[in-house]
Amino acid sequence: MQKFTVHQGLVAPMDRENVDTDAIIPKQFLKSIRKTGFGPNLFDEWRYLDAGFPGQDPASRKPNPDFVLNQARYKGASILLARKNFGCGSSREHAPWALDQFGFRAIIAPSYADIFFNNSFKNGLLPIVLPEAQVAQLFDEALAFPGYTLTIDLERQVIVKAQGEELPFDVQAFRKYCLLNGFDDIGLTLLQSDKIKAFEAQRLAGKPWLSHTVAG
C-alpha cells in the first residue's frame, strides 16, 4: 500500500449528498476477480452519457460534459471534496479501489458511511472529516478559484490552504500509523513474520505428521 505522509493536490468538488457505492462503482463492473482496473469506471453512470459494460474501451464512450470530473479545470484532481454521508449503500470494497485507481488520495466530507470509511483506510485512501461549515467554505473556494489546491499533512493532522490557513482534523492513531507506513492488513501481518516462522517451527517439532502430504 502506498504511504501517505504529505500530499498536495488539485481539489474536485462533488456537490452531492448521499453519494452511494453503486454510484461510485456500478454493480456491472464488480464481476472481475482482480483488485485492479476499476478507475476507468469510477462514477460511470455520471461520467458517461451511454451505458457502460466491463472491458469496454473508455475512449469509445460519450463523456458527460456537465459532470465535474470531466471538466478541464478538475483534470488530474487527487482530492475529492464531498457532502455528507459519502459512500453510503452496499459495502463493496471496490468503491475505494476505484477512487484510488482513478487518482484520488484523499476525500474531505462532513460524514461517511461507516463501512466505506473503514475500507478507505485499509486501501490507502484518507477520508477526512471536517465540520459541515468548513466543508461548505472549501466548496465555495474550490468553485470560485480554478486550480484550487490543498496540502494534507497527515503527520500534523492538518489541511493547509494555499494562503497558509490550517484546518485540523482527527484520525485514529492506529489508522494514521498504517497510512504513514503504507501498511495494509497483509503488511501488518508480515511485520510478525519472525513470530509466525517460530510458531510454525514449534508446531512442526511437536506435531511432525502435520507436514506430511497425502499421496494422490
UniProtKB/Swiss-Prot annotation:
Which CDD domains does this chain map to? IPMI_Swivel (cd01577)
Which keywords does the record carry?
Answer: Amino-acid biosynthesis, Branched-chain amino acid biosynthesis, Leucine biosynthesis, Lyase
Indicate yes or no for the key word Lyase.
yes
Q: What biological-process GO terms show up in the record?
A: L-leucine biosynthetic process
Which reaction equation describes what this protein catalyses? (2R,3S)-3-isopropylmalate = (2S)-2-isopropylmalate
What the entry lists under Pfam families is as follows: Aconitase_C
Pathway annotation from the record: Amino-acid biosynthesis; L-leucine biosynthesis; L-leucine from 3-methyl-2-oxobutanoate: step 2/4
Q: What is its EC number?
A: 4.2.1.33
Query: What general EC class does the enzyme of this chain belong to?
Result: lyase
List the InterPro entries hit by this protein, alphabetically: 3-IsopropMal_deHydase_ssu, Aconitase/3IPM_dehydase_swvl, AconitaseA/IPMdHydase_ssu_swvl, IPMI_Swivel, LeuD
Q: Where are the bilayer-spanning segments?
A: none
What domain of life?
A: Bacteria
A Gene Ontology term for the protein's cellular component = 3-isopropylmalate dehydratase complex
What functional role does this protein have? Catalyzes the isomerization between 2-isopropylmalate and 3-isopropylmalate, via the formation of 2-isopropylmaleate.
HAMAP family (alphabetical): LeuD_type1 (MF_01031)
Tell me the protein family, please: Belongs to the LeuD family. LeuD type 1 subfamily.
Write down what this protein is called. 3-isopropylmalate dehydratase small subunit
